[in-house]
Curated annotation (Swiss-Prot):
Protein name as it appears in the record: Catalase-peroxidase
Keywords: Heme, Hydrogen peroxide, Iron, Metal-binding, Oxidoreductase, Peroxidase
EC number(s) recorded for this UniProt protein: 1.11.1.21
Domain of life of the organism encoding this protein: Bacteria
Oligomer and partners: Homodimer or homotetramer.
Organism of origin: Geobacter sp. (strain M21)
Length: 733
């Protein structure tokens, strides 16, 4: 008889009773994943629904936290001794790697959620031994508790580390709220092995939206592409990867050189001495991983990246030492004790210029990584590095600004920053908005403006699609985009195909005429912005469409948006926000390897929509005739422009049979089951609401005979949510 007890539920002998059998996705791997729409449930959050992190952070004595971190950094612990007696370099790497997962392609990743605490990030090869950094910070977190999140603490500790070693940082903004389970919406790559690189195709074409070169790396391989020690080839990887993380060439050089001014690499021996990562380690390790069997397993015996050595002669002081060393020597390829490719000076005089991190009796030569030499040898990076070497103040300012951008890029506009150390300067990458300098319109003005809009000659379709185009650029991932600023009238958005530039121009000219007429009629300081008027136009159109369906209802509207200028808008930085697909407008720019319905769910997640909200918005946008190209696909109604539940009623009609119009199966014809008469055409995004069992369940709610009023109410609620996603001025007030 087995000594293992049987599970009281399944009756099976199993040491892991919580395990389950095959999941639905095991049987049907192509099943649409709606779970990304319902992440981070309050049920997983121990703080409770009434917890207000921003209020807690505002009550935090940030100076006291800084003092405690300063004290911690030079208080070396026997269980993980500090290199050079200072934990600063370790904390810089921790903060850098927390923020460095950000990518511009979809705005996901970054430091804002504190996700470095969870798998997979806590166990990525590139994050080896950062578990120790977080454990060292635990007494600080424990002391201040709910007043500072892990997400904020990781970044603030990095700032403190820089400051404690003599560097003046640009500032710090708090406000990052912790998540309590890993996010399921971030695609890290298709590889099934650490350091795999299936993400490349053709001649080193990197898959979107990925930025890192290999699975489990934050940026690039420091030994060179796939370990090939070619500095010029490494420069190409660096340029693409850092650009996909929102950094230009100068910012890239400043970040690499600034970061490598501090600390050292760890490769005291072969990787065979290193145990499992935290997620794979024994329960007795209590969250720690990478246990090392070489010598003491720590201090001078530490193995992390496999590379070994320091870049500068004083690794715990801010200076120009990185460039001094880089340009002072010629470099020869060598191998670390772990067998990793790195570079050492050809000049014998370099030996003994670098102190040992733990043994005062030892001295070493400096080393450089293949990626460091790229900063010297690349024809673009080289002159930038030379300029920084010759102008240390310029370098310091560039690094301060680039570090601030790195650690705050995913936080959104300055309105989201908290604390006394937020810089006053508006930075172009923050998508700045002008301050409001006028009195807001009131309810009477709103009613008057609605009347002018709906009698202006613009259709429900035109008004709805324009308002949606303006607001739906919002990405919850990095809080960019949205209707505030009315950037839809500026480059590059005004020229995006999905926004129907010719129609957009007509709508904007009409709304600007109404704006001018209204503003010029005011005797006081009252004004309406075009940003507000675009949204108000959409709201007025939805009200009219509801009225046409027999429902008198007011669509909520809150004025206060301002109008951004072109000079406040970085055209290059906004390019990644252009929709490759927008299922809500039945738009697909081209055919992709990912299905249209998957792209719809992805966009819904970025808009913070639940499955019911996504469903009701699709149904409403179709009957409001808001397709991007004015196509009839999915417009399952005989009365377009009227807010009815016809989309669901007709989609679920068993009197209709559907067939693809081509082998691509992206457009379908719906014909009468008896007569064969053509009734409708639709896309995958339309038909998925009848095909997918979960979405069909949602659609059936709105397709019932008693669902018309619920449909209108729910559509307006979801519409209003999207229109206000970027209204941080409201949320923070």
């Amino acid at each position: 008889m087995s000594t293992d007890s049987q599970c009281p539920v399944t009756g099976r002998a199993n040491k892991h009773a919580a395990r389950v059998g095959r999941m639905n996705r095991d049987w049907w791997p192509n099943q649409l994943n709606l779970k990304i729409l319902h992440q981070h449930s309050p049920l997983s959050n121990p703080m409770g629904g009434n917890f207000n992190y921003s209020e807690e952070f505002k009550a935090l004595d940030l100076a006291a936290v800084r003092n405690d971190i300063f004290e911690l950094m030079t208080n070396s612990q026997d269980w993980w001794p500090a290199d050079y007696g200072h934990y600063g370099p370790l904390f810089i790497r921790m903060a850098w790697h927390s923020a460095g997962t950000y990518r511009t392609g979809d705005g996901r990743g970054g430091a804002r959620s504190g996700s470095q605490r969870f798998a997979p990030l806590n166990s990525w090869p590139d994050n080896a031994n950062l578990d120790k950094a977080r454990m060292l910070l635990w007494p600080i977190k424990q002391k201040y508790g709910k007043k500072i999140s892990w997400a904020d603490l990781l970044i603030f500790a990095g700032n403190c580390a820089l400051e404690s070693m003599g560097f003046k940082t640009f500032g710090f903004g708090g406000g990052r709220e912790d998540i309590w389970e890993p996010g399921e919406d971030i695609y890290w790559g298709a590889e099934d092995t650490w350091l795999g690189d299936k993400r490349y195709s053709g001649e080193r074409l990197l898959e979107n939206p990925l930025a890192a070169v290999q699975m489990g790396l934050i940026y690039v391989n420091p030994e060179g592409p796939n370990g090939n020690p070619d500095p010029l080839a490494a420069a190409k990887d660096i340029r693409e990867t850092f650009a996909r993380m929102a950094m230009n060439d100068e910012e890239t050089v400043a970040l690499i050189a600034g970061g490598h001014t501090f600390g050292k690499c760890h490769g005291a021996g072969a990787a065979t001495h290193v145990g499992p990562e935290p997620e794979g380690a024994s329960i007795i390790e209590q969250g720690l991983g990478w246990k090392c069997s070489l010598g003491t397993g720590r201090g001078e015996h530490t193995i992390t990246s496999g590379l070994e050595g320091a870049w500068t002669t004083n690794p715990v002081k801010w200076d120009n030492g990185f460039f001094d060393v880089l340009f002072s020597y010629d470099w020869a390829l060598a191998k670390s004790p772990a067998g990793a490719h790195q570079w050492i000076p050809t000049d014998p005089a370099a030996k003994g210029t670098v102190p040992d991190a733990h043994n005062p009796a030892k001295r070493h030569a400096p080393m450089m990584l293949t990626t460091d030499l790229a900063l010297k040898l690349d024809p673009i990076y080289g002159p930038i590095s030379k300029r920084f070497h010759e102008q240390p103040d310029l370098f310091a300012d560039a690094f301060a600004r680039a570090w601030f951008k790195l650690t705050h890029r995913d936080m959104g506009p300055r309105a989201c920053y908290l604390g006394p150390e937020v810089p006053a300067e508006d930075l172009i990458w923050q998508d700045p908005l002008p301050a409001r300098n006028h009195e807001l319109i009131d309810d009477q003005d709103i009613a008057e403006l609605k009347g002018k809009i709906v009698t202006s000659g613009l259709s429900v379709s035109q008004l709805v699609s324009t308002a949606w185009a303006s607001a739906s650029t919002f990405r919850s991932s990095d809080r960019r985009g949205g209707a505030n600023g009315a950037r839809i009238r500026l480059a590059p958005q005004k020229d995006w195909e999905v926004n129907q530039p010719a129609q957009l121009k007509l709508v904007l000219e009409t709304l600007e005429g109404i704006q001018k007429q209204f503003n010029s009629a005011q005797s006081g300081g009252k004004r309406v912005s075009i940003a507000d008027l675009i949204v108000l136009g959409g709201c007025a159109a939805v009200e009219l469409a509801a009225r046409n369906a027999g429902h008198e209802i007011i669509v909520p509207f809150t004025p206060g948006r301002t109008d951004a200028a072109q000079e406040q808008t970085d055209v290059v930085a906004f390019a990644p926000l252009e929709p490759a697909a927008d299922g809500f407008r039945n738009y697909l720019k081209t055919r992709y390897s990912v299905s249209a319905e998957e792209l719809l769910v992805d966009r819904a997640q970025l808009l913070t929509l639940s499955a019911p909200e996504m469903t009701v918005l699709i149904g409403g946008m179709r009957v409001l005739d808001a397709n991007a190209d004015r196509s009839r696909h999915g417009v399952f109604t005989r009365r377009p422009g009227t807010l009815t539940n016809d989309f669901f009623v007709n989609l679920l009609d068993m009197g209709t049979t559907w067939n693809a119009t081509s082998e691509a199966e992206d457009v379908f014809e719906g014909r009468d089951r008896v007569t064969g008469e053509m009734k409708w055409t639709g896309t995958r995004v339309d038909l998925i609401f009848g095909s997918n069992s979960l979405l069909r369940a949602q659609a059936e709610v709105y397709g019932c005979k008693d669902a018309q009023e619920k449909f209108v109410v729910d559509f307006i609620a979801a519409w209003s949510k999207v229109m206000n996603l970027d209204r941080f001025d409201i949320a923070n007030s």
